Amino acid sequence: MATNFISYLTAGAAAMLLSACNGILSNIYDEPATDAVSEYGFVSEATTTSPGSIYIDATDYTVWTYIDFRSMTTTALDVNAPAPDSWDIAIHRYDAKTNGAEVMETGATSFYSLANVVTPAGSDYISDIWTETTIVTDMSTMMDGYLSYAGSFYNPELSKWLNVDKSSMPPIYTPSNKVYVIRLSDGTLAGVRLANYMDALGVKGYMTIEYMYPLKL
């Protein structure tokens, strides 16, 4: 009887310890929570006066999430898979690329003040660049001193929306809170702002993006 009771207490203590460790480690290593919000994509539609909202799961290092403003669709694909036929921007973790677009960071921290701080001057827009040392696909070897990367185009301007300082552990996350104007390949404009990079439980990699399309300046 006493042995069974002690075994029960030991098992309970172990379960509590494991639960606590999982909570701590999930915050450090950004593992998705099992009860995270399941509604992804275009959560609310933008109007001519107010931004809409896009919610995506960017926790997987092997996935690009493609966003199409015209059709209001999001598509998650493996980093090595061909891009969909129609898309405007894509997100990998906090990295971003565009479909032949150019991006400008503005001084506005909300869409309501955007018209007062920006003019669409061509010299301010930044195109994508090719990189083979930015898009991390495997973090499991970090403690061994190296990471795995995928070659990809990448937009350094739009990717400014969140700075991740990995010089210390855990990393320090600093959002710019800025609105980014995207000049799409057809000449129309879209605007995006990273409103949050965590879910309601504080798990990183769940991104809430405010957007306006078409954007009129």
Q: What are the residue ranges of the model-derived segments?
A:
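C-terminal motif of bacterial Sec signal peptides marking the signal peptidase cleavage site
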Residues: 18-20
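Bacterial N-terminal signal peptides that target proteins for export
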Residues: 1-10
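Surface-exposed, beta-sheet-biased, low-hydrophobicity segments with strongly acidic/polar composition
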Residues: 22-217
